[in-house]
């Protein structure tokens, strides 16, 4: 119960909402699993993610609250931004965040403020110390795969600051 309370408290403090499947999210990742079937992915939706606008719809194999120090990949999931929705600019201090755009069109903003149109097949990355944002600029949902990885070197560097 404590992990669920902690997850909901963090979501409240960050101004986001977590779907009713949050209890599933608190379970540690079963490290013997090597295939995550789409039907079994846990739903985790947020409103106004990182100060963005509108819903961010997610289905995750696992998230950072379920992984341990031994895991490089901290989060893997399918994300969808409906038309007009966005993920606000946010900084990654001790991990890398990769978006692999599957369908739709969007505007990616990097840590320098440079904006780039992205679409199916494009890949974006925010490395430790970099920020990024993404907005759906099209008329169709913007669907992308989200991969967050953490390295010991990145974590060590962020803790030394």
What is the predicted function of each stretch?
Residues 7-17:
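Bacterial N-terminal signal peptides
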Residues 113-128:
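Short acidic-glycine-tyrosine-enriched beta hairpin
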Residues 78-82, 91-108:
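Short, conserved beta-strand element in jelly-roll/cupin
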Residues 1-4:
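Positively charged n-region of N-terminal signal peptides that target proteins for export
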Residues 125, 139-155:
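A short hydrophobic beta-strand segment most commonly corresponding to one strand
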Residues 20-73, 155-161:
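A short, N-terminal "cap"/entry segment at the start of jelly-roll beta-barrel domains
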Residues 60-65, 75-92, 128:
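Conserved short histidine dyad/triad with adjacent acidic residue
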Residues 89, 108-109, 126, 132-138:
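Short beta-strand His + acidic residue motifs that chelate non-heme Fe in jelly-roll/DSBH
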């Amino acid at each position: 119960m404590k992990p669920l309370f902690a997850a909901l408290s963090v979501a409240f403090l960050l101004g986001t909402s977590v779907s009713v499947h949050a209890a599933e999210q608190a379970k540690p990742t079963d490290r013997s699993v090597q295939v995550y079937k789409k039907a079994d992915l846990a739903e985790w939706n947020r409103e106004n993610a990182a100060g963005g606008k509108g819903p961010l719809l997610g289905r995750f194999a696992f998230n950072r609250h379920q992984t341990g120090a031994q895991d490089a990949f901290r989060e893997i999931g399918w994300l969808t931004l409906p038309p007009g929705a966005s993920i606000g600019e946010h900084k990654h201090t001790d991990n890398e965040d990769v978006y692999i755009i599957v369908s739709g069109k969007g505007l990616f903003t990097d840590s320098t403020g440079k904006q780039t149109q992205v679409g199916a097949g494009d890949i974006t990355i925010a490395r430790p110390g970099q920020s990024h944002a993404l907005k759906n600029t099209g008329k169709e949902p913007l669907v992308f795969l989200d991969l967050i990885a953490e390295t010991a070197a990145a974590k060590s560097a962020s803790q030394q600051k």
